[in-house]
Curated annotation (Swiss-Prot):
It catalyses: a hydroperoxide + [thioredoxin]-dithiol = an alcohol + [thioredoxin]-disulfide + H2O. This is Thiol peroxidase. Disulfide bonds join C60-C93. Thiol-specific peroxidase that catalyzes the reduction of hydrogen peroxide and organic hydroperoxides to water and alcohols, respectively. Plays a role in cell protection against oxidative stress by detoxifying peroxides. One of its GO terms (molecular function) is thioredoxin peroxidase activity. PANTHER family: THIOL PEROXIDASE (PTHR43110:SF1).
């Protein structure tokens, strides 16, 4: 079982670990209007999946903004996934004036977290991570941030996304 830290406390991750080079597993999450969404909804597009513990924290807020600002010029889609309720995600987008940010909730059954191995067992939140998938859903980049309150490597993730 993979272990990270969150605020310097050890945290165990549950689920199946995903590796670069493998086909990305499907998942079911909810959009801001409670519609079920899966990987199939973004078929044929390259994807940058930004995973955050909670959209309402400073680091998660900055991570979401940075990836959406930097990747906006690229073809493809940026998805931000957290275990927040869809209502909280929708409120965050509205209160920050961000209409084009795609936030998806894994709150219902942690399907994404289990399929990608990023469920923090002790907190029932998702571990900060980034996955870049090509248009055929092959994982071309993965980063699992070892300390949950740190930022991911924005440059490496964006380079992988741009180079698809």
């Amino acid at each position: 079982m993979t272990q990270i830290t969150f605020k310097n406390n050890p945290i165990h991750l549950a689920g199946s670990e995903v590796s670069e080079g493998q086909h990305a597993p499907d998942f079911k999450v909810l959009d801001n209007d409670l519609n079920e969404v899966s990987l199939e909804n973004y078929k044929g597009q390259k994807k940058l999946i930004s995973v955050v513990p909670s959209i309402d924290t400073g680091v998660c807020d900055q991570q979401t903004r940075k990836f959406n600002e930097e990747a906006a010029q690229e073809d493809g889609v940026v998805l931000t996934i957290s275990a927040d309720l869809p209502f909280a995600q929708k409120r965050w987008c509205a209160s920050n004036g961000l209409d084009n940010v795609i936030t998806l909730s894994d709150h219902k059954d942690l399907s994404f977290g289990q399929q990608y191995g990023v469920v923090m067992e002790e907190l029932r939140l998702l571990a900060r991570s980034v996955f870049v998938l090509d248009s055929n859903d092959k994982v071309v980049y993965k980063e699992l941030v070892s300390e949950g309150t740190d930022f991911p490597n924005f440059d490496a993730a964006l380079e992988a996304y741009r180079n698809i």
